[in-house]
Structure formats: C-alpha cells, structure tokens
Amino acid sequence: MKAKHIVKIEIKCQSADEMLKAKSAVLYHLETLNPEFQANENVLTVTVPTLDSKLFYPDEACKIIHDTLAQSLTFVHEWTCTLHNIN
C-alpha cells in the first residue's frame, strides 16, 4: 500500500541541543512510522508517510501524531503538525 499523504512536523529550535532533544522525542514516539528528518538552520522538519486505511483516515493520523508529540515537545517554543496530499 502506497502512502497518499504525509504528516509534516516543523519544529523551531533555539539551539543545536534543543534540536537533538526534539529529534530524540520524535524518534521515541514515531520510529516505527519511518520518519524522515531534515535540519535547516534552526528548523527541524520531519515527514511521516501515512497509509490510507479503513482504520485511520489521514486527518485522524495527523491528529494522533500531533497529540502524541504535544506531550513530549513541551520544551520547544514553536512547532506545527500538518497533513499534506502527495498525489
């Protein structure tokens, strides 16, 4: 089954140490979803493919990911979690 959507997480970090801590938090919760990381200056961008299935619609998957990370990224000043269509 091919992913039709991705969840994109953008985390604005204030230091390299904070970026490492954020990456560790994301990996801890989402490692089985094969997240891809890209760092650009002070922003850590994470993309996670979502599979369309009868169990979770993509917008539900995005909300679950957001709610899960919200508990771990409390130390980060600003971050977003959005759903994108890749068709």
Question: Where is each model-derived feature located?
Answer:
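Short, extreme N-terminal segment that most often corresponds to the first beta-strand
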Residues: M1-A22
